């Protein structure tokens, strides 16, 4: 349910929200056409190529996929956010619910897979697993292997590079046979186009000048979600001071608020070990990988092994919380946000 809000500057807050269906998919024509090409056979009940959609946060991955599925594949597609549904059972229940079946508590995972198999025998279906890296590690191979075994078409969405899949069982990787499609960060001019489009829908005419849209875009780090949050914050801040239009001071305060909120949301995606590692790094801002791992091991009795630590750091870099400089034993990690 959308929050009801109407002010002298913002007349409709919905276009500034993440869930708002876009009126136009800006600067993603290539990705849209490529995805449509690989999904189109499903409309004729033919198999599709499994897709791996990747790129930094706020680059339009989820927005574009949901738009395509809802507009062209509504009857045969299920979308699952794996940050909310992390286990095999939760994912299967969510998929089956989409196709009209409510799972019983007494049913085992094997029963749910059989029920899904009954559906796939009647029609070719597509399942999108958004934030696929958030699936519980012990369940990841099970759910992916068995879904492919049922001839389900899969769309996997992640912030992380395709190399994250190296942690899967080789048999699962081979079965998936994924085609990778990258969503790079938006360029400044692309963010400005998106910002102006949403500005025209959300703000009273003349209250959010083009120059302020550009300023917000310059501080958005290629992230359209961050841009919209900055614009929303700026509009509300301007209204709070009874201004007639958004000015530089409103945008800059909006930037600070938006980045604080983004950081808190990203930290929610970390497990307890990752949060400890991040906290250690945050204190020094920059640490050699070896020193960071040793400090973590001293603080945590049941610490993870070096290989898992590297995977955790890879994940935090993919989220944009940290960045890695250098390779192997010379690697240094830095805090980004």
What are these regions (language model features)?
Residues 287-337:
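Terminal-proximal interaction/regulatory segments of ATP-powered molecular machines
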């Amino acid at each position: 349910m959308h929050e009801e809000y109407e002010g002298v500057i913002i007349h409709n807050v919905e276009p500034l929200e993440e869930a708002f269906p876009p009126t136009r998919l800006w600067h993603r024509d290539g990705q849209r056409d490529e995805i449509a090409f690989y999904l189109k056979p499903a409309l004729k009940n033919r198999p599709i190529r499994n897709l791996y959609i990747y790129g930094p946060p706020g680059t339009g991955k989820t927005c574009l996929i949901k738009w395509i599925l809802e507009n062209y594949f509504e009857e045969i597609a299920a979308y699952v956010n794996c940050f909310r549904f992390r286990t095999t059972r939760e994912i299967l229940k969510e998929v089956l619910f989409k196709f009209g079946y409510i799972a019983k508590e007494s049913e085992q995972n094997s029963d749910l897979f059989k029920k899904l198999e009954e559906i796939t025998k009647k029609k070719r279906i597509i399942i999108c697993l958004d934030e696929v890296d958030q699936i519980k590690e012990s369940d990841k191979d099970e759910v992916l292997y068995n879904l492919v075994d049922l001839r389900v078409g899969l769309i996997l969405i992640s912030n992380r590079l395709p190399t994250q899949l190296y942690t899967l069982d080789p048999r699962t990787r081979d079965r998936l046979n994924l085609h990778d499609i990258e969503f790079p960060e938006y360029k400044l001019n692309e963010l400005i186009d998106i910002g102006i489009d949403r500005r025209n829908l959300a703000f009273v005419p003349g209250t959010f000048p083009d120059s302020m849209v550009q300023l917000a875009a310059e501080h958005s780090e290629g992230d359209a979600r961050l841009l919209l949050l900055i614009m929303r914050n700026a509009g509300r801040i301007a209204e709070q001071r009874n201004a007639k239009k958004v000015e530089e001071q409103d945008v800059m305060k909006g930037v600070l608020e938006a980045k604080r909120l983004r950081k808190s949301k990203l930290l929610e995606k970390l497990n307890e070990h990752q949060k400890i590692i991040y906290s250690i790094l945050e204190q020094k801002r920059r640490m050699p990988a070896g020193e960071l791992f040793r400090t973590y091991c001293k603080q945590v009795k049941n610490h993870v092994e070096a290989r898992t630590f590297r995977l955790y750091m890879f994940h935090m870099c993919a989220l944009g919380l940290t960045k890695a400089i250098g390779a192997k034993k010379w690697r240094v990690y830095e805090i980004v946000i």
